[in-house]
A protein has these predicted regions:
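Active-site helix-to-loop segments that bind/position phosphate- or nucleotide-bearing substrates
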Residues: 1-182
Length: 182
């Protein structure tokens, strides 16, 4: 009932309206956000000057510009931050992947934290995580081939949905837990 009431109440500001850092220079913005990753992902040439980058970021609501300088929006930081840890409000939104030995949480084999903005860190997270998933080895006529127990596309979609649909007002890390059987 409490969660349902919260959903119906709504009233949360859009991510592109919430500012996390204010009064920044263009150089400060480029220190905190990855312009190279943005333009690469959008299949656009990287502008030759900082002004072109800032104009594009403003048009995409990744940053805002006013008389005191630039402000990074929560949207901009969440997807293109070089380090989410640079933003107090997002420190607990880094993705944690924990691999356990066996079928319970008694023994951790390894833990990896992915600190980059979700858009720029997603590929490396997917790659690392898929390397941790249980797999079998199929022997064909001449070659051996790794066969994942779970299709990569399904896991990729689950993780993307976890990140996109999380409640950012809730405390806690987005977490992926991997066990020997799942």
């Amino acid at each position: 009932p409490a969660k349902e009431a919260k959903i119906w109440r709504g009233g949360q500001k859009a991510l592109e309206k919430i500012t996390l850092k204010k009064g920044l220079s263009s150089q400060d913005v480029l220190t905190l956000l990855s312009a190279e990753a943005y333009f690469d992902m959008m299949h656009l040439p990287l502008p030759q000057d900082t002004k072109g980058i800032m104009e594009r970021f403003v048009s995409e609501n990744l940053i805002l510009h006013d008389e005191v300088g630039y402000s990074i929006t929560e949207l901009g930081a969440l997807v293109f931050a070089k380090s989410l840890g640079d933003f107090d409000e997002l420190k607990r939104k880094v993705v944690r992947v924990i691999v356990y030995k066996g079928k319970n949480k008694l023994e951790t084999i390894r833990e990896q934290v992915f600190d980059k903005g979700y858009a720029i860190g997603f590929e490396s997270m997917v790659s690392w995580r898929n390397g941790q998933l249980p797999s079998d080895e199929e022997i064909g006529q001449a070659l051996r081939k790794d066969a994942r127990m779970y299709p990569e596309i399904a896991i990729r979609e689950l993780v993307a949905n976890m990140l996109i649909h999380q409640d950012l007002s809730e405390q806690g890390f987005p977490m992926i837990e991997i066990y020997s059987d799942r």
